Amino acid sequence: MAFQGTSRTLTQQSSAATSDELQKILFSPDAIKKMAAECDLGRHHWMRADNAISVRPLVPEVTHGRIASFFKSGYDAGELCSKGYMSVPQVLCAVTRTVSTDAEGSLRIYLADLGDKELSPIDKQCVTLHNHDLPALVSFQPTYDCPMETVGNRKRCFAVVVERHGYVGYTGTTASVCSNWQARFSSKNNNYTHIAAGKTLVLPFNRLAEQTKPSAVARLLKSQLNNIESSQYVLTDSKINQNARSESEELNVESPPVAIGSSSASRFESFRPQVVNGL
Protein backbone atom coordinates (compact mmCIF):
# COMPACT_ATOMS: atom_id res chain seq x y z
CA MET A 1 0.00 0.00 0.00
CA ALA A 2 1.36 3.40 -0.96
CA PHE A 3 2.24 5.85 1.77
CA GLN A 4 -0.58 8.38 2.15
CA GLY A 5 1.00 10.80 4.62
CA THR A 6 2.66 14.16 4.15
CA SER A 7 6.14 15.55 4.77
CA ARG A 8 4.97 17.85 7.55
CA THR A 9 7.26 16.11 10.06
CA LEU A 10 10.30 16.98 7.97
CA THR A 11 9.16 20.58 7.78
CA GLN A 12 8.81 20.78 11.55
CA GLN A 13 12.25 19.27 12.02
CA SER A 14 13.92 21.55 9.51
CA SER A 15 12.56 24.64 11.26
CA ALA A 16 14.14 23.72 14.58
CA ALA A 17 16.14 26.39 16.39
CA THR A 18 19.78 26.74 15.30
CA SER A 19 22.77 26.85 17.60
CA ASP A 20 24.27 30.00 19.07
CA GLU A 21 27.33 29.64 16.84
CA LEU A 22 25.23 29.60 13.69
CA GLN A 23 23.23 32.59 14.95
CA LYS A 24 26.46 34.55 15.31
CA ILE A 25 27.51 33.62 11.78
CA LEU A 26 24.21 34.79 10.32
CA PHE A 27 23.42 37.85 12.41
CA SER A 28 26.73 39.37 13.39
CA PRO A 29 27.18 43.04 12.36
CA ASP A 30 29.72 41.99 9.74
CA ALA A 31 27.39 39.35 8.27
CA ILE A 32 24.51 41.83 8.07
CA LYS A 33 26.71 44.35 6.24
CA LYS A 34 27.79 41.71 3.75
CA MET A 35 24.17 40.72 3.11
CA ALA A 36 23.42 44.31 2.17
CA ALA A 37 26.60 45.01 0.20
CA GLU A 38 26.92 41.74 -1.74
CA CYS A 39 23.32 40.56 -1.98
CA ASP A 40 21.40 43.89 -2.01
CA LEU A 41 19.06 42.59 0.69
CA GLY A 42 16.46 45.33 1.19
CA ARG A 43 18.40 47.76 -1.01
CA HIS A 44 17.56 49.30 -4.37
CA HIS A 45 19.50 47.83 -7.29
CA TRP A 46 19.68 50.05 -10.37
CA MET A 47 19.38 48.41 -13.80
CA ARG A 48 21.70 50.24 -16.21
CA ALA A 49 22.88 49.57 -19.75
CA ASP A 50 26.33 48.60 -18.41
CA ASN A 51 24.68 46.13 -16.01
CA ALA A 52 22.10 44.55 -18.28
CA ILE A 53 22.23 41.20 -16.45
CA SER A 54 22.31 41.18 -12.66
CA VAL A 55 22.91 37.99 -10.64
CA ARG A 56 22.50 38.50 -6.91
CA PRO A 57 23.14 35.44 -4.67
CA LEU A 58 20.97 35.30 -1.56
CA VAL A 59 23.98 34.46 0.64
CA PRO A 60 27.37 36.27 0.54
CA GLU A 61 30.35 34.08 -0.36
CA VAL A 62 32.09 34.58 2.99
CA THR A 63 28.93 33.83 4.95
CA HIS A 64 28.25 30.80 2.74
CA GLY A 65 31.73 29.45 3.48
CA ARG A 66 31.34 29.89 7.24
CA ILE A 67 27.91 28.25 7.28
CA ALA A 68 29.11 25.32 5.15
CA SER A 69 32.14 24.89 7.42
CA PHE A 70 29.89 24.86 10.50
CA PHE A 71 27.66 22.11 9.13
CA LYS A 72 30.56 20.09 7.72
CA SER A 73 32.38 20.02 11.06
CA GLY A 74 29.20 18.88 12.80
CA TYR A 75 28.59 16.26 10.11
CA ASP A 76 32.14 14.89 10.29
CA ALA A 77 31.87 14.69 14.08
CA GLY A 78 28.61 12.76 13.81
CA GLU A 79 26.61 15.53 15.49
CA LEU A 80 24.59 16.59 12.41
CA CYS A 81 22.80 14.45 9.84
CA SER A 82 23.92 16.46 6.79
CA LYS A 83 26.28 19.17 5.57
CA GLY A 84 23.53 21.78 5.60
CA TYR A 85 20.70 23.15 3.49
CA MET A 86 19.51 26.64 2.63
CA SER A 87 15.75 27.25 2.74
CA VAL A 88 14.02 30.36 1.37
CA PRO A 89 10.20 30.34 1.75
CA GLN A 90 9.70 33.34 -0.53
CA VAL A 91 11.55 36.09 -2.36
CA LEU A 92 9.67 39.37 -2.85
CA CYS A 93 10.84 42.00 -5.37
CA ALA A 94 9.48 45.53 -5.69
CA VAL A 95 10.13 46.97 -9.16
CA THR A 96 9.73 50.61 -10.21
CA ARG A 97 10.63 52.39 -13.44
CA THR A 98 12.94 55.41 -13.54
CA VAL A 99 12.16 56.53 -17.09
CA SER A 100 9.07 57.69 -18.97
CA THR A 101 6.31 55.21 -19.79
CA ASP A 102 7.11 55.83 -23.48
CA ALA A 103 10.47 54.05 -23.16
CA GLU A 104 10.36 50.69 -24.96
CA GLY A 105 11.92 48.06 -22.73
CA SER A 106 11.27 45.24 -20.30
CA LEU A 107 12.76 43.34 -17.36
CA ARG A 108 12.94 39.57 -17.01
CA ILE A 109 13.18 38.47 -13.37
CA TYR A 110 13.53 34.96 -12.01
CA LEU A 111 15.02 32.83 -9.24
CA ALA A 112 17.96 30.58 -10.16
CA ASP A 113 20.23 28.00 -8.53
CA LEU A 114 23.95 28.83 -8.79
CA GLY A 115 24.58 25.09 -9.06
CA ASP A 116 23.06 25.29 -12.55
CA LYS A 117 25.59 26.52 -15.13
CA GLU A 118 22.79 27.74 -17.38
CA LEU A 119 21.14 29.70 -14.54
CA SER A 120 17.72 28.54 -15.69
CA PRO A 121 14.61 29.70 -13.79
CA ILE A 122 13.70 27.32 -10.95
CA ASP A 123 10.55 25.40 -11.96
CA LYS A 124 9.98 27.96 -14.73
CA GLN A 125 9.23 30.68 -12.17
CA CYS A 126 9.94 33.67 -14.38
CA VAL A 127 8.24 37.05 -14.77
CA THR A 128 8.54 39.60 -17.60
CA LEU A 129 7.60 43.19 -16.81
CA HIS A 130 7.21 45.80 -19.54
CA ASN A 131 8.25 49.33 -18.71
CA HIS A 132 4.73 50.73 -19.06
CA ASP A 133 3.40 48.12 -16.57
CA LEU A 134 5.52 49.33 -13.65
CA PRO A 135 5.44 49.60 -10.68
CA ALA A 136 4.92 45.96 -9.72
CA LEU A 137 5.50 43.37 -7.00
CA VAL A 138 6.99 39.98 -7.91
CA SER A 139 7.28 36.88 -5.70
CA PHE A 140 9.06 33.53 -6.05
CA GLN A 141 8.78 30.33 -3.97
CA PRO A 142 11.51 27.66 -4.36
CA THR A 143 10.21 24.08 -4.32
CA TYR A 144 13.28 22.59 -2.61
CA ASP A 145 16.03 23.41 -0.14
CA CYS A 146 19.46 24.11 -1.61
CA PRO A 147 22.48 22.08 -0.37
CA MET A 148 25.29 24.23 1.02
CA GLU A 149 27.97 22.89 -1.30
CA THR A 150 30.60 24.12 -3.72
CA VAL A 151 30.18 23.21 -7.40
CA GLY A 152 33.38 23.89 -9.30
CA ASN A 153 34.35 27.37 -8.17
CA ARG A 154 30.76 28.37 -7.40
CA LYS A 155 29.21 28.33 -3.95
CA ARG A 156 25.76 26.90 -4.49
CA CYS A 157 22.75 28.88 -3.29
CA PHE A 158 19.66 30.59 -4.68
CA ALA A 159 20.07 33.83 -6.62
CA VAL A 160 17.83 36.55 -8.05
CA VAL A 161 18.53 37.16 -11.74
CA VAL A 162 17.33 40.34 -13.49
CA GLU A 163 17.77 40.88 -17.24
CA ARG A 164 17.24 44.21 -18.97
CA HIS A 165 15.96 44.16 -22.56
CA GLY A 166 15.36 47.04 -24.98
CA TYR A 167 15.63 50.62 -23.71
CA VAL A 168 17.50 51.70 -26.85
CA GLY A 169 19.13 55.07 -26.24
CA TYR A 170 18.83 54.83 -22.46
CA THR A 171 22.30 54.28 -21.02
CA GLY A 172 21.42 55.25 -17.46
CA THR A 173 19.17 53.61 -14.89
CA THR A 174 15.82 52.52 -16.32
CA ALA A 175 14.42 50.55 -13.39
CA SER A 176 14.99 49.93 -9.69
CA VAL A 177 14.64 46.49 -8.11
CA CYS A 178 14.42 46.05 -4.34
CA SER A 179 14.45 42.41 -3.15
CA ASN A 180 13.65 41.00 0.28
CA TRP A 181 13.89 37.47 1.64
CA GLN A 182 14.70 35.50 4.79
CA ALA A 183 17.15 32.64 4.41
CA ARG A 184 17.04 29.71 6.82
CA PHE A 185 19.63 26.99 7.34
CA SER A 186 19.16 23.48 8.69
CA SER A 187 20.67 20.00 8.61
CA LYS A 188 17.36 18.63 7.23
CA ASN A 189 15.52 19.46 4.04
CA ASN A 190 12.16 19.08 2.33
CA ASN A 191 10.26 19.60 -0.93
CA TYR A 192 7.41 22.07 -1.31
CA THR A 193 4.29 22.60 -3.38
CA HIS A 194 4.95 24.19 -6.74
CA ILE A 195 3.52 27.70 -6.94
CA ALA A 196 3.77 29.85 -10.05
CA ALA A 197 5.69 33.10 -9.79
CA GLY A 198 3.43 35.90 -8.62
CA LYS A 199 3.10 39.25 -10.37
CA THR A 200 0.98 42.10 -9.03
CA LEU A 201 0.82 45.39 -10.92
CA VAL A 202 0.59 48.39 -8.62
CA LEU A 203 -1.20 51.63 -9.47
CA PRO A 204 1.19 54.60 -9.45
CA PHE A 205 0.65 56.92 -6.50
CA ASN A 206 -1.35 60.07 -7.32
CA ARG A 207 0.48 62.53 -5.10
CA LEU A 208 -1.67 65.46 -6.26
CA ALA A 209 -4.98 63.85 -5.35
CA GLU A 210 -5.14 65.53 -1.94
CA GLN A 211 -3.55 68.81 -2.97
CA THR A 212 -5.79 70.07 -5.78
CA LYS A 213 -8.13 72.18 -3.66
CA PRO A 214 -8.38 75.92 -4.59
CA SER A 215 -7.18 76.90 -1.13
CA ALA A 216 -3.84 75.21 -1.74
CA VAL A 217 -3.47 76.95 -5.10
CA ALA A 218 -4.43 80.29 -3.58
CA ARG A 219 -1.77 79.89 -0.90
CA LEU A 220 0.81 79.10 -3.55
CA LEU A 221 -0.02 82.20 -5.61
CA LYS A 222 -0.13 84.41 -2.53
CA SER A 223 3.28 83.22 -1.37
CA GLN A 224 4.72 83.93 -4.83
CA LEU A 225 3.22 87.43 -4.99
CA ASN A 226 4.48 88.29 -1.51
CA ASN A 227 8.02 87.43 -2.55
CA ILE A 228 8.06 90.02 -5.37
CA GLU A 229 10.06 93.14 -4.60
CA SER A 230 7.79 96.23 -4.78
CA SER A 231 10.67 98.31 -6.17
CA GLN A 232 10.81 96.07 -9.23
CA TYR A 233 7.16 95.22 -9.78
CA VAL A 234 4.24 97.46 -8.85
CA LEU A 235 0.67 96.19 -9.03
CA THR A 236 -1.19 99.34 -10.07
CA ASP A 237 -4.63 97.79 -10.32
CA SER A 238 -6.06 95.56 -7.58
CA LYS A 239 -8.52 94.14 -10.10
CA ILE A 240 -5.67 92.50 -12.02
CA ASN A 241 -4.55 90.81 -8.83
CA GLN A 242 -8.05 89.50 -8.19
CA ASN A 243 -8.43 88.16 -11.72
CA ALA A 244 -5.10 86.41 -11.51
CA ARG A 245 -6.13 84.77 -8.27
CA SER A 246 -9.50 83.55 -9.54
CA GLU A 247 -7.97 82.09 -12.69
CA SER A 248 -5.24 80.35 -10.75
CA GLU A 249 -7.77 78.64 -8.51
CA GLU A 250 -8.86 76.54 -11.49
CA LEU A 251 -5.33 75.23 -12.02
CA ASN A 252 -4.31 71.76 -10.89
CA VAL A 253 -0.90 72.34 -9.32
CA GLU A 254 0.92 71.11 -6.26
CA SER A 255 1.23 73.19 -3.12
CA PRO A 256 4.71 74.40 -2.10
CA PRO A 257 6.97 72.42 0.24
CA VAL A 258 6.28 72.96 3.93
CA ALA A 259 8.97 73.24 6.55
CA ILE A 260 9.49 70.11 8.64
CA GLY A 261 8.16 70.46 12.15
CA SER A 262 5.56 73.12 11.34
CA SER A 263 1.83 72.63 11.85
CA SER A 264 1.33 72.68 8.08
CA ALA A 265 3.93 69.95 7.68
CA SER A 266 2.06 67.64 10.04
CA ARG A 267 -1.14 68.33 8.12
CA PHE A 268 0.40 67.42 4.78
CA GLU A 269 2.15 64.41 6.30
CA SER A 270 -1.23 62.70 6.65
CA PHE A 271 -1.63 62.75 2.86
CA ARG A 272 1.39 60.55 2.28
CA PRO A 273 0.57 56.89 1.47
CA GLN A 274 1.80 53.80 3.22
CA VAL A 275 4.57 52.58 0.93
CA VAL A 276 6.46 49.31 0.62
CA ASN A 277 10.05 49.20 -0.66
CA GLY A 278 9.74 52.53 -2.39
CA LEU A 279 6.53 51.79 -4.29
Curated annotation (Swiss-Prot):
The domain of life is Viruses
Record-annotated membrane-spanning stretches = none
Q: Name one GO biological process term.
A: transport of virus in host, cell to cell
GO annotations of cellular component type: host cell plasmodesma
| Xref: Pfam families | 3A
Q: What's in the keyword line of the UniProt record? A: Host cell junction, Transport, Viral movement protein
Q: What is its main location?
A: host cell
Where located?
A: Host cell junction, Host plasmodesma
Family per similarity comment: Belongs to the cucumovirus movement protein family.
Q: What does this protein do?
A: Transports viral genome to neighboring plant cells directly through plasmosdesmata, without any budding. The movement protein allows efficient cell to cell propagation, by bypassing the host cell wall barrier. Acts by forming a tubular structure at the host plasmodesmata, enlarging it enough to allow free passage of virion capsids.
Q: Mind telling me what this protein is named?
A: Movement protein
Q: Where does this protein come from, organism-wise?
A: Cucumber mosaic virus (strain M48) (CMV)
